[in-house]
Amino acid sequence: MARMEYYVLSEGGRWKVRHDGKNYHYETQARAIRDAVDAAHQAGRMGHDAQVLVQSHTGAWRTEWTYGHDPYPPPG
């Protein structure tokens, strides 16, 4: 199965999660990350590899969470 990727990025002062060609909008980065991790965890439980990536203010991407390698729920 293909890896499910969830991208958390800022746009116009708000945050969004992009997954499978759709955007989901949030007021805070923390909430966007939490929901992306929750969705990735559910995808992982259904047999998919899953990853959450977060874009910094410089445009660089970092891995926030991967299914099977990080604790769930994430701390914080």
Each PLM stretch: what is its role?
Residues 27-45, 49:
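A short, charged, amphipathic alpha-helix used as a generic interaction element across diverse proteins
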Residues 5-11, 51-58:
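Short beta-strand segments and strand-loop junctions that repeat across beta-rich extracellular domains
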Residues 2-23:
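Short aromatic-glycine-(Arg/Gly/Cys) micro-motifs in beta-strand/loop hairpins
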